Amino acid sequence: MAQDTNNLIWLDMEMTGLNPDQDRIIEVAMIVTDSNLNVLAESPVLVIHQPDAILDGMDDWNKNTHGKSGLIEKVKNSTVSEAEAEQLLLEFMMQHVPERATPMCGNTIHQDRRFMARWMPKLEAYFHYRNLDVSTLKELCKRWRPEIAKGVVKRGKHEALADILESIEEMRYYREHFLKV
């Protein structure tokens, strides 16, 4: 597939916590859509190995959530480093968008960007500096059209690929019902 400046790269990461200075990325995936939110391609879901010392430092919410999903065990068994994941995702992006053409797309995407800037800086630099954040529409809709906001159903699996697909679905919902495009 050729690069297209109108393509959007959607991203989600699972992390060991919320602080990029002490916590680490443990799972990441990307989806490419066209400007109409049609899915064009999915990256592999990359589970990133982290040492036990990092995993042991997770708070109860993260231990419980990532333990139930099986992600902690996958992280322990993974041989993929952050640097390898960064390179694979960079190569994936290069197939679909030119450098600095796509905003970083997702839900509360600034948090993913913070971790990416800390642990995958080359990948972060390939994105445009803008974000396309579904959570902005969510917050506006809750305040301006709460009856529409109630129509959004969140499954909250906290798995990278599932969360991206849910974000795209949520954006489609806001486009149709809130923005009416």
From Swiss-Prot:
The source's domain of life comes to Bacteria
Which keywords has UniProt assigned to this entry?
A: Cytoplasm, Exonuclease, Hydrolase, Nuclease
Q: What does this protein do?
A: 3'-to-5' exoribonuclease specific for small oligoribonucleotides.
**Domain annotation Exonuclease: ranges:** 8-171
Q: Which Pfam families match?
A: RNase_T (PF00929)
Q: Where in the cell is it found?
A: Cytoplasm
Q: Which HAMAP family match?
A: Oligoribonuclease
Q: What is this protein called?
A: Oligoribonuclease
The Swiss-Prot or TrEMBL record annotates one GO molecular function as: 3'-5'-RNA exonuclease activity
Protein source organism: Chromobacterium violaceum (strain ATCC 12472 / DSM 30191 / JCM 1249 / CCUG 213 / NBRC 12614 / NCIMB 9131 / NCTC 9757 / MK)
- GO CC list: cytoplasm
Q: Per the UniProt entry, what are the Gene Ontology biological process annotations, in alphabetical order? A: DNA metabolic process
Cite the active-site annotation.
129
Which family does the record assign? Answer: Belongs to the oligoribonuclease family.
Write the Enzyme Commission number(s) for this entry: 3.1.15.-
The residues forming the signal peptide are none
